[in-house]
Design a protein with these regions (language model features):
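A short acidic, Gly/Pro-enriched loop at the edge of an enzyme's catalytic core
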Residues: 56-67
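Conserved class I S-adenosyl-L-methionine
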Residues: 2-10
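Class I SAM-dependent methyltransferase SAM/SAH-binding core
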Residues: 12-56
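Short "lid" loop at the C-terminus of a central beta-strand within the Rossmann-like core
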Residues: 100-105, 139-142
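A short SAM/SAH-binding and catalytic strip from SAM-dependent methyltransferases
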Residues: 66-78
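Conserved beta-strand signature within the Rossmann-like core of class I S-adenosyl-L-methionine
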Residues: 93-100
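A short glycine-rich, Lys/Arg-flanked "PGG" loop and its adjoining helix->strand segment in the class I
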Residues: 80-91
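Substrate-binding/catalytic lobe of Class I Rossmann-like enzymes that use SAM or dcSAM, i.e.
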Residues: 111-188
Length: 189
């Protein structure tokens, strides 16, 4: 039975599977809606903290066997994520990161590249600086590349269409469009 800190645990789907396997799971997620979903999905068997990882305070003396970043590492400053995780681990603990990273490859296209992530070279330098070591690494770019190509094509097509609609609305209904943008930014940012 492992004590696992699921950082940025989404709706709790991964935590649900880990709880079923018998692990002790604590979830840190910044969204009220997602934190409620985590409680539902784990049937209350995981501790759920509605906070950003940067602000998370464990119970006194609490440490973890695993700090899990499942597609969440890219949203936290890398140095903070690694330093804080290191302090939360027990003696033989592991930081597990399953996420996207930026390569050094140049993007000569005018199109936005899909995906996010910290530059891999910077993360490697931080790992060395913090005296951490990589015990396993798996490159899956080739297996996800077809999906990324589809996402890029969709983004190019829909992005162009939405931009044209926005320009038309702004030209014909500038006040309504500005009011819409104001409320959109309040509720979705």
């Amino acid at each position: 039975k492992l004590k696992i800190l699921d950082i940025g645990g989404g709706a709790g789907e991964t935590a649900k599977k880990l709880v079923i396997l018998g692990h002790d799971v604590t979830i840190v997620v910044p969204s009220k809606i997602l934190s409620e979903r985590c409680v539902e999905n784990t049937k209350g068997k995981a501790q759920v903290h509605k906070t950003q990882f940067e602000d998370y305070q464990p119970e006194k003396g609490q440490s973890f066997d695993v700090c899990l970043f499942s597609e969440s590492f890219q949203y936290i400053p890398a140095k903070i994520a690694l330093e804080k995780s290191k302090t939360l681990l027990n003696k033989n603990g592991t930081i597990l990161i399953a996420d996207c990273f930026r390569s050094e490859e140049k993007n000569n296209s005018h199109n936005r590249r899909p995906g996010g992530g910290h530059p891999l070279s910077e993360v490697r330098a931080l790992i060395k600086e913090l005296n951490l070591k990589i015990i396993s690494e798996k490159e899956i770019t080739k297996s996800v590349a077809p999906s990324l190509d589809i996402e890029q094509q969709f983004y190019n097509m829909m992005g162009f269409a939405f931009d044209r609609i926005r320009q038309g609305l702004l030209a014909n209904h500038p006040i309504k469009t500005k009011i819409f943008h104001f409320f959109y930014n309040i509720f979705l940012n």
